[in-house]
Amino acid sequence: MAEYNTEQFEKDCKALGVTLSDEQIRQFLKYFEMLVEWNEVMNLTAITEYDEVMKKHFVDSISLCKAYDVTQNKIVIDVGTGAGFPGLALKIAFPNLQVTLLDSLNKRINFLNEVISAL
């Protein structure tokens, strides 16, 4: 895995009241790398630059914690998850959640299954 500066990402998460472990940060970085890799062969997202993915996909997904109490064991379904936002990002940040990712396209489901296996 390449080296990434995660300082801003961690700061943005802390501003939401979320402190990520080293393992969670590693999972987000792996997710980012796989997103960019798979996006080269299938259109998962228009946002592929590191800083933008961290802010516009990951932090924005985690920000759901401000509107919805995710500290308790909850069941969440992400309908039309696409590349896994917000569902998979929420699952990484809040492992206590039971998250179901739902999408109509098999290529996206295949991508998500690969990411989940890698994490």
Residue ranges of each PLM-predicted region?
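Class I SAM-dependent transferase core
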Residues: 1-4, 8-73, 77, 114-119
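Conserved SAM/SAH cofactor-binding pocket of Class I
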Residues: 62-119
